[in-house]
Amino acid sequence: NVVDGLLENDRYGNFVPSMAEDWSVSKDGLTYTYTIRKDAKWYTSEGEEYAAVKAQDFVTGLKYAADKKSDALYLVQESIKGLDAYVKGEIKDFSQVGIKALDDQTIQYTLNKPESFWNSKTTMGVMAPVNEEFLNSKGDDFAKGTDPSSILYNGPFLLKSIVAKSSVEFAKNPNYWDKDNVHIDKVKLSFWDGQDTNKPTEAFKDGSFTMARLFPTSASYTETEKAFKDNIVYTQQDSTTYLVG
């Protein structure tokens, strides 16, 4: 993950602190208040410190998503007070939307109605923070898919390179606030065109991949299952099966 939101899920699906070190909910279930950790920083793609992560970054991030009509906006558009009206142009002032930076470390959301699952939405990209100064400096080049330097990073990994139809490479952020719990130094995702279903498995067998998608319909599935039965992770039917080394 290159950009962290307020909360994240642990391996059991429980919500745990990320950029928010603590949070509270009003008795009526309409107001969620999060305290931003003071040791959270923004970094460039080269790992240089850019700025502290502040509550206002979450306001900027949501406004950016709304102004750009993000495809994921539907997740929160009718949840946050005033957001739907802003997106539809019924109000022009974003300060009327139910998101407020009370100070540098405190961000507050006001909902239209109680949502017991609201915290799950804070893990979504549409709720991610954006540094306003950096956003303005990049203009239309902000978050340009092929350019690692077009975004800032507050997460455990930095995007190092992205080559269309080839690979995407990440490196551990050495300054990440929780770096001691990040145990992988580099990640490389290799492109696969979906044609030869045996290709990912073969790459796993020869050590090129540490994880590969496994297709039960592939010609080599039975052989692979026998050889790597302890490495196969099965998921739900609407998900994917992987070999993990």
Language-model-detected regions and their locations in the chain:
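Ligand-site clamp/hinge motif
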Residues: 142-148, 174-223
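N-terminal lobe/hinge region of extracytoplasmic solute-binding protein
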Residues: 1-27, 152
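Surface-exposed binding/hinge segments that line
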Residues: 35, 56-57, 64-134
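Local pocket/hinge segments that shape ligand/substrate recognition
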Residues: 213-245
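A structural "hinge/loop" feature
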Residues: 1, 19-20, 44-49, 118-129, ...
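Aromatic- and charge-enriched surface segment that lines or borders ligand/interaction sites
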Residues: 21-74, 108, 203
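Gly/Pro-rich hinge or "lid" segments in bacterial periplasmic/extracellular proteins
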Residues: 92-95, 105, 110-182, 186
